[in-house]
Amino acid sequence: MDFVNNDTRQIAKNLLGVKVIYQDTTQTYTGYIVETEAYLGLNDRAAHGYGGKITPKVTSLYKRGGTIYAHVMHTHLLINFVTKSEGIPEGVLIRAIEPEDGLSAMFRNRGKKGYEVTNGPGKWTKAFNIPRAIDGATLNDCRLSIDTKNRKYPKDIIASPRIGIPNKGDWTHKSLRYTVKGNPFVSRMRKSDCMFPEDTWK
């Protein structure tokens, strides 16, 4: 997948259905991306790179597309895939995963079962046992990788405003969150909108 030359919004859509693999020391975790958010850098008031701000914690966001930007929010580890060329702080937040391999270990790691295991940006990273130290690593050159060949394809994609970013003017309302329609592993999914996971893919 080209993380440098494509538009960040398009990358966020293209990532839906892509297989994520995390190889721990004794356990392999896999699942399919069902929810993403695009963050558009310098002009995006909700982005960590807004206005060109650089601090030690966001250094990875300014690296070349394909870098992993991992940051902690409210004690939860959030994983972003950096996009664009070095120096342009854009990226895609991976918000939710439909789990596949390593389910029993995920249940242990999370202390939860069912859709709650991976239906949020801090939930799936805890389920996969991903450490903060992965920040700055290159996707597919470390324990975290994606498989764009053995993937799924959404039947429908819904675009909506991003979660949890009030008071950012127009950026609060821009439809930069992308979800697999009806997939029950999407965060904040209403039960009435849920479908069986297998019915949400082509």
Swiss-Prot record:
Residue ranges crossing the lipid bilayer per the database entry: none
Task: Offer one example of a GO biological process linked to this entry.
Answer: base-excision repair
* Signal sequence extent: none
Q: Which enzyme class? A: hydrolase
Q: Which SUPFAM superfamilies match?
A: FMT C-terminal domain-like
Quote the EC number: 3.2.2.-
Lineage top rank: taxon: Bacteria
- Report keywords, A-Z: DNA damage, DNA repair, Hydrolase
Recorded hits in Pfam families, A to Z, give: Pur_DNA_glyco
- Which molecular function GO terms apply here? alkylbase DNA N-glycosylase activity; DNA binding
What family does this belong to?
A: Belongs to the DNA glycosylase MPG family.
**Record NCBIfam families:** 3mg
PANTHER family hit by this protein: DNA-3-METHYLADENINE GLYCOSYLASE (PTHR10429:SF0)
Please state what the protein is called.
Answer: Putative 3-methyladenine DNA glycosylase
Which organism is this protein's natural source? Staphylococcus aureus (strain bovine RF122 / ET3-1)
